[in-house]
C-alpha cells in the first residue's frame, strides 16, 4: 500500500500542508507528518501561528534509503521559513534525489518548497512554484511555467496556497484508483 510523507518545519504554510493532508486522509491512504527541526517534542509553529505536533521527526529515519522503504510520496510544502529549512536540509535533499531515481516514487513540491528541486540538484525540468521564487528557479536552469500545477515525470509542482487542493488531487491521481480519486474529488465539492 502507498504511504505518504508530508514534511513540515517551523514556518510551513498551513494551507499547503492541510490540503494534501486532508485529501490523502479522505482517500484512506496512510500519511505521516515528518518534522524537520530541533524541537524534541515535534511541535511545529506554522507560518500563520497555527501550532501542531508532527507524527515523527526526520531524525528517526536513519537514511534516505530507509525513507524510501517506508514512503512512496514525499511532499515538500512552502511557506518562507519552512521552505528555507526544508530546501537546505541535507536529509530532505537526499530523499528528493533518491526518489527522483526510483520508479513508483513521487515528489510533490509547492510554493517556495519548489526551491528544493534546485538545492537537491534535480535535472532541469519544467516546473512551477510561487512567483516570488520564479527567478531563482530560472537561474537554476528550470523552465518556469505559469500554471497552477505541473507534472513532469515523477515531480509534481504547484504555485501556492490557492492551488493547494489541485496539487493534492494531482498527487492522489497518480497513486489512487480512478474510483477512489473520483470519490475524493466529489467529497471535496470542487467547482
From Swiss-Prot:
Locations listed in the record: Cytoplasm; Nucleus
Substrates-to-products reaction catalysed: methylglyoxal + H2O = (R)-lactate + H(+)
Molecular function via GO: glyoxalase III activity
Active site: 16, 111, 130
Keywords per UniProt: Cytoplasm, Lyase, Nucleus, Stress response
Reported effect, residue 130 to A: Leads to 5- to 6-fold reduction in catalytic efficiency
GO process terms (BP): cellular detoxification; glyoxal metabolic process; response to oxidative stress
Gene3D superfamilies, per database record: 3.40.50.880
Enzyme Commission number(s) from the entry: 4.2.1.130
Function: Catalyzes the conversion of methylglyoxal (MG) to D-lactate in a single glutathione (GSH)-independent step. May play a role in detoxifying endogenously produced glyoxals. Involved in protection against reactive oxygen species (ROS).
Listed PANTHER family: PARKINSON DISEASE PROTEIN 7 HOMOLOG, PROTEIN/NUCLEIC ACID DEGLYCASE DJ-1-RELATED
Protein name as it appears in the record: Glutathione-independent glyoxalase DJ-1
Organism classification: Eukaryota, Fungi, Dikarya, Ascomycota, Taphrinomycotina
Amino acid at each position: 500500500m502507498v504511504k505518504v510523507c508530508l514534511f513540515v518545519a517551523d514556518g510551513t504554510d498551513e494551507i499547503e500542508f492541510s490540503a494534501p493532508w486532508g485529501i490523502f486522509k479522505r482517500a484512506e491512504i496512510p500519511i505521516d507528518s515528518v518534522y524537520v527541526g530541533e524541537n524534541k517534542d515535534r511541535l511545529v509553529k506554522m507560518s500563520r501561528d497555527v501550532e501542531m505536533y508532527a507524527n515523527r521527526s526526520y531524525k528517526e529515519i536513519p537514511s534516505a534509503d530507509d525513507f524510501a522503504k517506508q514512503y512512496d510520496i514525499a511532499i515538500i510544502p512552502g511557506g518562507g521559513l519552512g521552505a528555507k529549512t526544508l530546501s537546505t536540509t541535507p536529509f530532505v535533499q537526499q530523499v528528493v534525489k533518491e526518489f527522483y531515481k526510483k520508479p513508483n516514487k513521487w515528489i510533490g513540491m509547492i510554493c517556495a518548497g519548489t526551491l528544493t528541486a534546485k538545492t537537491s540538484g534535480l535535472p532541469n525540468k519544467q516546473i512551477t512554484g510561487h512567483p516570488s521564487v520564479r527567478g531563482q528557479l530560472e537561474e537554476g536552469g528550470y523552465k518556469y511555467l505559469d500554471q497552477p500545477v505541473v507534472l513532469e515525470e515523477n515531480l509534481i509542482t504547484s504555485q501556492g496556497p490557492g492551488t493547494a487542493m489541485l496539487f493534492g488531487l494531482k498527487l492522489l491521481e497518480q497513486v489512487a484508483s480512478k474510483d477512489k480519486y473520483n470519490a475524493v474529488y466529489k467529497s471535496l465539492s470542487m467547482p
